[in-house]
A protein has these predicted regions:
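Non-catalytic C-terminal interaction segments of nucleic acid-processing enzymes
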Residues: 2-3, 12-17, 100-197
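Acidic-residue sensor for enzyme active/binding pockets
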Residues: 11, 55-57
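Active-site beta-strand-loop-beta-strand hairpin of nuclease catalytic cores
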Residues: 37-55
Length: 197
């Protein structure tokens, strides 16, 4: 791993950055159903108050980042306005170089930018790297929309519902772990009480 931060820590930092109290922020969404506007697994989806959809692929290592380009689909659905990779800060230059290479070889691929996080979970949003027209050795960075389609109310609700389902499943896991720990504590008490002195 190129970070010591857990996936959950990164998700919480992203949710805060994208103002989860104002916008709909959901994680690990698998697109299915007539009203869900994505047809693949998404690490993070953000629906803005104005109805636009942002997809974020979260990567914790360089190998994980490279694996993304082995997927058969690199083109994003028309429903996604912004598409970002979220990576450890120290991978920034290598990632931009790789994205330039992928764009050269695959004209269907596009992205809006890179979101960087450091070990303190500070989030920085960087735009898509564009070579300067006047000075080929220089770059500019823009947050590049890849589509401009707003979501319908039914689509927003479908994504929010998937987020709620995911939350309930996660809470169930926590309860199961707590119950397992409670059973383990009881087992420890039995072992201690059986211990002859």
């Amino acid at each position: 791993m190129d970070t010591n931060r857990s996936l959950y820590e990164i998700e919480v930092a992203l949710a805060k950055h994208f103002e989860y109290l104002k916008n709909i922020v959901v994680f690990n969404v698998v697109g299915w159903g007539a009203d869900v506007p994505v047809e693949h697994e998404c690490d993070c989806l953000v629906i803005s108050k104005s109805g636009y959809l942002t997809e974020i692929e979260i990567k914790r290592s360089w190998a994980d980042f490279l694996n993304d380009f082995k997927k058969t689909h690199l083109k994003r659905e028309d429903s996604i306005k912004y598409f970002y990779y979220c990576i450890p800060e120290k991978l920034s230059e290598k990632a931009y170089d790789k994205l330039d290479e992928v764009i050269e070889s695959n004209k269907d691929f596009d992205y809006s930018g890179i979101i960087l996080y450091d070990e303190n979970l500070n989030i920085t949003v960087g735009g898509k790297r564009i070579k300067s027209f006047f000075d080929p050795g220089k770059y500019s960075y823009i947050n590049n929309p890849i589509h401009y389609n707003k979501l319908y109310l039914e689509q927003k609700l479908a994504i929010a519902r998937l987020g709620c389902i995911k939350t309930i499943k996660e809470k169930k896991k926590i309860i199961d772990l707590q119950n397992k720990d409670a059973i383990s504590d009881v087992d420890d008490e039995l072992l201690i009480s059986d211990d002859p002195e």
